[in-house]
């Protein structure tokens, strides 16, 4: 029964392993379904663990029957009663319980194609290029014949496509093909050895007759082909022997320990099972177009095609794994175990590629693997660099936080805090960076440069923190200096003397020396340079001087200094040398005392006007080197700061003091006048004489005397109990309340009178109008 209607046929039992497929139809078209069919056979993932065998020979010689018996295939067989062509084109089927793909090639010398031998030549060449073992099926009586034994076809194939075999390895150890001649209906009259010798002789004759290139003239057929020969009894006449010999022949295909095992590794075309369809299709295309068949090139093309497919599949899976991690990296987050994940993705992709692609052409496989690694790394590299940047930012933030936390306490060593934070930052970054490296030592996976950038920024942050802490420390020392010099300076300026500025400057220098010692002691842990210490000390001196100058300004303001001058003047004018207050008498020398006290006081104004200690060692000078402290450096003139009172201010102060001193002088003069104008003593005698009767009346009147005693006793008790003040306050409060109540009553009375006046005003106006009206009427009557 012909099988040309369908490309794929399945037996009724539905077993996919028994399906057969027409890979090339009678119109010389290659099927696109071979890859799918190989997968249905379960051979797609076999790699090199499969074999491929083909059969060709004359039409109706039982090729399909032989294959079905040998391999358990399901090819259609000829209807012996009709003797017509059964196999058209090339069919393929899997051997039963065998990893063998079997090709059944259309028979040659058939009446259906007649003189058209093009397909015969192309199918034979296709079979030679694809199969490990090529079974040449012939009858015993065809041995020695040229056409019947297909010698003419083999010669044509060898002659036209000599390049196919010439490009194989010169040592003949690779790319070899086994030609298995199966001689059917062997009677036994002619021994197999004789038949074998005849066939070998014919094949060598064909090979020798070929026109070969100069570099292949000495090559023999055995350099490229191995040949094996076997016979089978008549299938119809001796069926039992036929089946027995077929079974023996089958063992040569299945039993690797068999001495005559046919599927030797040297015959394998090294085409992985998943690439067989593509390889065969390209071979057929080359054969169909009558192009020189270059098997190595075809193998490379197949390798490129399959390696690209495998690489694309591995890359697609890799991209699906890597995609979810892009967003957190772009968002600036550090992804935990990113390096381990990337290495796993990369390893999985390469493992998948290696598992399937390593079976193909070594050069292509290696080249495509390199390309795949480059693509994978180009995807992983942004993740790696992003992870480094995020680690950089995270470590820098942590470093700043660690420093700030370490500087919160009262007692801390700045250098230790910075070093501890720096070590932790460096360790965290290096551990994270090393973990993120996909391939250690490979180009594009270095993180040392990013580490250097991080350390530079860490150094900059540490320097800034050191500067801030230095300023903070200087500010603290400045406040301490201000606190320490405030009271002593105020005391020295309040009690002026010729060595006043010596005392002030000594106090200032002692305090400044302590401040500098405090700074240097703390600055050791800051790892400050000599230049930084010099600038800091210069800034500290300026700040301390400004603090001192501010205190002096406070104590020498107009009111404060005028008060000091008045106090100094009063001590010398109002008090004697022993500090006893003076009560001026008319005969005292007020003018002399006033002049002396005034002159001594005015001598203080030049003393206050300029900071100038008598001891030259106590003179203070600011360093002339520049400082970056803007707070103390803005237009600061040290020379002018030594002047406390300008000439104008001194003159104004002197004038104000003279006015105050003159007031004290006038007051002193008035006190002497008041002592002169006191009541004469004789007036007291007059008062006693004139008031004696009234005094006696009070003393001898019981009522008045009792009231007097009560008043005196009450006054005594109030004074003894200290109730004088509270009593006066109560008296004032009562008087104030009485006054308030009286005022309110008076306002009410006045307000009521005004209201009555307003109410009576309309009535008065009406009466006035009536009076005027009556007067007018009276005048009219008198006129009449």
Curated annotation (Swiss-Prot):
InterPro entries the UniProt entry points to: G_GB1_RHD3_dom (IPR030386), P-loop_NTPase (IPR027417), RHD3/Sey1 (IPR008803), Sey1/RHD3-like_3HB (IPR046758)
Tree of life domain: Eukaryota
Pfam families, sorted: RHD3_GTPase (PF05879), Sey1_3HB (PF20428)
Single GO BP term: endoplasmic reticulum membrane fusion
MF annotations from Gene Ontology: GTP binding; GTPase activity
Membrane-spanning residues: 679-699, 703-723
Role summary: Cooperates with the reticulon proteins and tubule-shaping DP1 family proteins to generate and maintain the structure of the tubular endoplasmic reticulum network. Has GTPase activity, which is required for its function in ER organization.
Compartments where found: Endoplasmic reticulum membrane
Organism of provenance: Coprinopsis cinerea (strain Okayama-7 / 130 / ATCC MYA-4618 / FGSC 9003) (Inky cap fungus)
Coiled-coil residue spans: 447-487
Membrane topology summary: Multi-pass membrane protein
Ranges for region Disordered: 764-784
PANTHER family for the chain: PROTEIN SEY1 (PTHR45923:SF2)
HAMAP family, sorted: Sey1
Protein name: Protein SEY1
Lumenal compartment residues: 700-702
Sequence ranges on the Cytoplasmic membrane side: 1-678, 724-784
GO cellular component, one term: endoplasmic reticulum membrane
Gene3D superfamilies with a match to the protein in the record: P-loop containing nucleotide triphosphate hydrolases (3.40.50.300)
